[in-house]
């Protein structure tokens, strides 16, 4: 028995009508990933050629873009993972929602070339206008239907549309030597309801046109470019482009025939060399020392890698896997399963502030803080989805699939133009030279790298620049928070801050001076990662706490600071030369005790887990080492724990509910210090252990510890 609704139609009929109507309006939309329209802070940037690589938006995003386009809405349309990106329909551009980043061309997918890429908006618009003149029978869904006999099937194009060359260099160099008529499409011939051909000339006459009208031309187009009014996704394309950075590490090594120690040692050396090379993957980092690292080609390749990961972190397979035939706006590939929103509920907002080295982003595209924060967000989601323990800490209704945490970058350095920047003239003091003019020429690439990376610390020590930095970061924090609230008006959760390197010092000072640098939100957890706070506050004769530890601290002219937040964490790698402890600044007694160690995440798949596995494997292969020796190292007696006094416990729990501020990443069995020192300071945001720790602390309920046990240092 059919159940009728208030509109007088059976509910099942209404559902079918709604779904058909949804199919009818569905048109896939795409965004470029290879050539940016613009780059932030590079006003001189110009595109040399049109983008050739496009990725599809999800079905939900495409539907909303299509509706907004028809309504001619001026407000940006939020798209992709967590709506972290937006589309400006007036300029057909995709850009980040909350931070500065490259903008990319957006296209409405109606006509596609032989590479399955959407044609440009201008060309598509003109072709569609001509296509409608053919007046195909809407009731006939056969794509091979030819134009009516009385209709004209070939038209001259009004616009100037360049012929795409596979070899960009050939196009660029050859354009000046060829006639304009040879380098642009002038005509279009419609072969059937789904296929057409673009031609630059009609030199072949009637014979060429007759061939293009035949079915054979679709398999072997001659002197023409075939385009189709359909889009088909091949899942193998994504697989081929997938990066396999650790593939070489899995290659079986040649077995050593004899069992001598010397042969085994040589095998170990070979294994060590190859595994270290693959493990740390320093090729990109070492390019910083290469004078050619800032070449346009290198920048384009690295930016394309970031684009494919950052702008496409969401499960866009729902849009990509939809094989769509566009016939008068109809789509046969969309399904109700694919039509879902990228929006998710967020109860915890994390804002990350970068530190030293971010000026490198102006010169080397692959040193990009927004990219590393996107990796942190991605790691958090992957680890959360695989961890029942983390899910059990989440009280949200959708805890199974949503960690309810959002992570956004705060990129402040590019917004400040210091007079000490390498080649910028000193406007305030024109008699002073630029930084490049006082730089010694010896080992120039290394000097430039160190200047770009370490100069910000020297700038921060100077009061004038320090105030400029604090004002700018405060402004960026408030701006990002306001934008987030604008697009997420229902958000009423907690805000947490993460500071990396100098960024941690900046956050420490902002939260310690809230009357001068006021934030528009309360801070819950404050994470310092790879932080030099311990050193800089020691130089400033500043202790950390709510009040002086001893009454005569004030008489000794010691400053005591306490950031306005609930809990403070100081996380670092033992090999990081920039990091320093903070607990001894709370009480000198803590200098006699070890820091606590970051728990190793069993779901981790990054550098830490690979180092641990690698060190254990190498240890087993060492001559004279057996399983019993290795096991004895694991089961060696632990150091005896000492209980802290009530006064010290109260002081520490006033800064962190656990009573511990310093958290070191677990050391591996095999430390390669010279490599670790280079890599450790810049790879925190890529570490799954860091992502898991931040997630755990944010989702956990905090109750102050009544007792604190520590381990005394040895030696």
Curated annotation (Swiss-Prot):
Gene Ontology cellular component list: cytoplasm; mitochondrial matrix; mitochondrion
Enzyme class, broadest EC rank: hydrolase
Disordered, as annotated region: 161-180, 242-268, 311-340
Subcellular localization: Mitochondrion
MF (Gene Ontology): metal ion binding; phospholipase A1 activity; phospholipase activity
Catalytic-site annotation from UniProt: 501
Keyword tags: Hydrolase, Lipid degradation, Lipid metabolism, Mitochondrion, Transit peptide
Transit peptide, residues from-to: 1-22
Compositionally biased region (Low complexity): 242-251
Domain of life: Eukaryota
GO biological process: cardiolipin metabolic process; lipid catabolic process; phosphatidylethanolamine metabolic process; phospholipid metabolic process
Compositional bias of kind Polar residues: 311-324
PROSITE patterns assigned: DDHD (PS51043), LIPASE_SER (PS00120)
Domain DDHD, residue spans: 519-700
Function: Probable phospholipase that hydrolyzes phosphatidic acid.
Protein family per UniProt: Belongs to the PA-PLA1 family.
Protein name, UniProt field: Probable phospholipase YOR022C, mitochondrial
Source organism phylogeny: Eukaryota, Fungi, Dikarya, Ascomycota, Saccharomycotina
């Amino acid at each position: 028995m059919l159940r009728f609704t208030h509109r007088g139609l059976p509910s099942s009929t209404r559902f079918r009508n709604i779904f058909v109507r949804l199919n009818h309006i569905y048109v896939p939309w795409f965004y470029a990933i290879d050539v940016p329209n613009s780059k932030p802070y590079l006003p001189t940037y110009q595109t040399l050629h049109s983008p050739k690589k496009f990725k599809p938006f999800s079905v939900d995003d495409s539907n909303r873009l299509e509706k907004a386009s028809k309504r001619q809405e001026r407000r940006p349309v939020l798209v992709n993972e967590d709506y972290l990106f937006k589309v400006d329909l007036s300029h057909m551009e995709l850009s980040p929602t909350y931070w500065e980043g490259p903008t990319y061309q957006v296209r409405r997918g109606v006509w596609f070339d032989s590479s399955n890429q959407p044609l440009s908006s201008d060309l598509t618009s003109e072709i569609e206008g001509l296509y409608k003149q053919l007046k195909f029978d809407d009731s006939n869904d056969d794509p091979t239907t030819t134009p009516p006999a009385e209709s004209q099937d070939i038209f001259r194009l009004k616009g100037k549309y360049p012929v795409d060359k596979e070899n960009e260099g050939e196009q660029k160099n050859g354009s000046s030597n060829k006639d304009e008529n040879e380098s642009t499409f002038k005509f279009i011939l419609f072969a059937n309801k789904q296929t057409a051909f673009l031609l630059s000339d009609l030199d072949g006459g009637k014979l060429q046109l007759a061939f293009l009208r035949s079915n054979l031309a679709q398999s072997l187009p001659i002197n023409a470019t075939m385009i189709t009014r359909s889009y088909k996704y091949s899942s193998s394309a994504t697989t081929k482009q997938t990066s396999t950075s650790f593939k070489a590490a899995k290659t079986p090594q040649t077995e050593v025939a004899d069992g001598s120690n010397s042969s085994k040692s040589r095998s170990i050396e070979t294994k060590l060399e190859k595994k270290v090379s693959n493990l740390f993957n320093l090729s990109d980092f070492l390019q910083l020392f290469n004078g050619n690292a800032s070449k346009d080609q290198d920048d384009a390749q690295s930016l394309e890698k970031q684009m494919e990961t950052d702008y496409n972190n969401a499960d866009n397979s729902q849009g990509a896997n939809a094989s769509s035939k566009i016939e008068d706006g109809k789509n046969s590939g969309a399904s109700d399963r694919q039509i879902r929103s990228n929006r998710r509920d967020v109860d915890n907002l994390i804002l990350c502030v970068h530190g030293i080295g971010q000026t490198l982003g102006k010169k080397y595209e692959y040193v990009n803080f927004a990219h590393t924060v996107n990796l942190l967000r991605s790691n958090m989601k992957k680890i959360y989805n695989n961890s029942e323990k983390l899910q059990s800490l989440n009280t949200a209704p959708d805890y199974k699939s949503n960690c309810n945490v959002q992570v956004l970058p705060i990129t402040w350095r590019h917004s400040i133009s210091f007079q000490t920047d390498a080649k910028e003239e000193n406007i305030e003091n024109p008699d002073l030279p630029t930084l490049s003019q006082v730089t010694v020429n010896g080992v120039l690439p290394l000097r430039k790298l160190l200047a770009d990376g370490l100069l910000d610390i020297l700038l921060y020590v100077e009061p004038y620049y320090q105030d400029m930095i604090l004002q700018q970061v405060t402004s960026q924090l408030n701006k990002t928070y306001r934008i987030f609230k604008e697009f997420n008006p229902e958000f009423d959760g907690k805000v947490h801050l993460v500071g990396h390197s100098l960024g941690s010092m900046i956050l420490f000072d902002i939260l310690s001076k809230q009357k001068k640098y006021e934030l528009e939100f309360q801070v819950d957890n404050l994470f310092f990662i790879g932080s030099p706070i311990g050193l800089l506050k020691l130089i400033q004769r500043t202790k950390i706490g709510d009040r002086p530890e001893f009454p005569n601290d004030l008489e000794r002219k010691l400053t005591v600071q306490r950031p306005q937040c609930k809990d403070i964490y100081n996380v670092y790698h033992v090999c990081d030369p920039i990091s320093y402890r903070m607990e001894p600044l709370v009480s000198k007694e803590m200098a006699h005790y070890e820091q606590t160690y970051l728990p190793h995440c069993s779901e981790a798949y990054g550098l830490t887990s690979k180092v641990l596995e690698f060190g254990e494997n190498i240890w087993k292969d060492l001559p004279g080492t057996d399983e019993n020796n290795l096991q004895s190292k694991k089961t060696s007696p632990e150091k005896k724990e000492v209980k802290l006094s009530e006064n010290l416990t109260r002081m520490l729990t006033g800064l962190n509910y656990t009573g511990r501020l310093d958290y070191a990443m677990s050391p591996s069995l095999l430390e390669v210090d010279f490599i670790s020192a280079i890599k450790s300071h810049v790879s925190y945001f890529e570490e799954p252990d860091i992502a898991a720790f931040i997630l755990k602390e944010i989702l956990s309920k905090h109750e102050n510890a009544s007792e604190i046990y520590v381990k005394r240092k040895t030696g």
